[in-house]
Amino acid sequence: MSDSTDALPIETHPFEPFLPAHARLLMLGTFPPAPKRWCMEWYYPNFTNDMWRIIGICFFGDKLHFVDTEHKTYRLDALKAFLREKGIAIFDTCLRIRRTTGTASDKDLEVVEQADLDGMLRALPLCQGVLAAGQLATTLFTEHYGIDARKMKMGEHRDFVFEGREIGLYREPSSSRAYPMKVEEKAKFYDRMFAELGLYDDNDKSL
């Protein structure tokens, strides 16, 4: 840590962990973007990020299912209710950070304090899968649990054991528009993960 970064403000994660007790999937990013980029006060708040469009495609066959196009935001109440019903938990791998350049890019974040990963998994006794979104989130998670994720291809998962439970760590395409893949193609990867974890029911329009 340099003197120049020491002078930068420390940001604490702005959102509470979303941890439905029956969740079978935990989605972990790195840290939210700066508030000026938000279209709502919740996870994946950048309107150009495609995470909630991917969810819409996989479960409803409609990338705009959770999108409020008129107001350029997301239908947050419907989104939270859906994730709670399906058993999808969300938080990030970093609790406190410094932004070295003011962006949300992994390479521009200095980790001050990591999130309590063990505590999250203990709070989710039925969790069978973890999606670490982004390289820094994956690195922090794999280093913490001693997982060898080298040569791990897109769409694959690596199993690890936490307190007697076998859990799969999944690698999926980034939902950021900076990742060069159409949202429909990204959704195909996520679809397989959701199916493997048993998140679909007869009413869902899986791919």
Model-identified regions with their sequence ranges:
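Short, surface-exposed acidic-centric catalytic microdomains
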Residues: 40-109
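A generic fold-level signal
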Residues: 20-22, 85, 164
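Short, conserved, surface-exposed binding loops centered on an aromatic residue
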Residues: 18, 80-83, 122-123
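C-terminal capping/extension of enzyme domains
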Residues: 1-17, 33-35, 45-47, 54, ...
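Internal catalytic-core helix/loop-beta-alpha segment
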Residues: 85-144
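Short, hydrophobic/glycine-enriched beta-strand segments
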Residues: 20-30
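A general structural motif
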Residues: 22-23, 126-128, 166
